[in-house]
Amino acid sequence: DGVLLMGSIGEFTALSMDERVSLIHAARTMTHLPLIANVSGTCMEDMTRLADAAYSEGYEAVMALPHYYFAQTPRQLEAYFDTLGGRFEGEWLIYNFPARTGCDVDAALIAKLAARFPRFMGVKDTVDCASHTRAIVRAAAEVREDFSVLCGFDEYFIPNLMNGGDGVLS
């Protein structure tokens, strides 16, 4: 159990940087549950600032979407997450939501990044297809035992568990 701060329903895109940093601090003062901060944005410097704020407040991890304005090729996605993986100083997750970003972080890329970055702890796969998430579970298991695959839709919670995934982040 834990809390995801500033997910899609949290309307993070409508908040200023200062508001997002303030929320990161305020949420920590309100609960001792594990916290994950969505640090997605269109500027790497802002994303790094948000991640640093979350880590300094003791957040369990941060989560990031692919760039959500310009759809990216698989090669561009890999370069993007390589850059983020080098900047994030703590645990992090990828938030895969192709309906909102126009691109899909597929199982092969997830496995490649999981092998490359020990602090890359998991993925929230918000895809309306249980077999997509199952493919990520299988690919990640080939390279890491400690990698977490979470579905993003409640109705896939049980199928995700049955396929070896770790639950839902909703």
PLM regions and their residue ranges:
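Catalytic alpha/beta core domains of metabolic enzymes, predominantly
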Residues: 87, 99-170
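Active-site beta->alpha loop and helix N-cap motifs at the rims of alpha/beta catalytic domains
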Residues: 1-104
